[in-house]
From Swiss-Prot:
UniProt GO cellular component terms: extracellular region
SUPFAM superfamilies linked: C-type lectin-like
Protein keywords: Disulfide bond, Hemostasis impairing toxin, Platelet aggregation activating toxin, Secreted, Toxin
Family: Belongs to the snaclec family.
PANTHER family hit by this protein: MANNOSE, PHOSPHOLIPASE, LECTIN RECEPTOR RELATED
Function: Snaclec that binds to von Willebrand factor (VWF) and induces its interaction with GPIbalpha (GP1BA) (via the vWF A1 domain), resulting in platelet aggregation. Intravenous injection in mice induces a dose-dependent drop in platelet count (thrombocytopenia). Pretreatment by intravenous injection by this protein in mice potentiates the hemorrhagic lesion in the skin provoked by the metalloproteinase BaP1 intradermally injected. This result is not observed when both BaP1 and this protein are injected simultaneously.
Gene3D superfamilies membership: Mannose-Binding Protein A, subunit A
Organism phylogeny: Eukaryota, Metazoa, Chordata, Craniata, Vertebrata
Disulfide cross-links: C2-C13
Gene Ontology molecular function: any one: toxin activity
Annotated localization: Secreted
Listed name of the protein: Snaclec aspercetin subunit alpha
C-type lectin domain boundaries: 9-62
Assembly mode: Heterodimer; disulfide-linked.
Length: 62
């Protein structure tokens, strides 16, 4: 189970954060959000679709 505000896909938790950050700041930020947290690293096509949809949904919210 993922914390409130996070989305689950194949046993992993994902969350879109705003505003944009550079790579180093984003990685640091992600490690502070949850134990084992890190920037997403796409491993397979289904995960790519899931993350793409998550980004699109969050950008549409503004």
């Amino acid at each position: 189970d993922c914390p409130s505000g996070w989305s689950s896909y194949e046993g992993h938790c994902y969350r879109f954060f705003h505003p944009p950050k550079d790579w180093a700041d984003a990685e640091r930020f992600c490690t502070e959000q949850a134990k084992g947290g890190a920037l997403v690293s796409i491993q397979r096509f289904g995960e790519e679709d899931f993350v793409s949809n998550l980004i699109t949904k969050n950008l549409q919210r503004g």
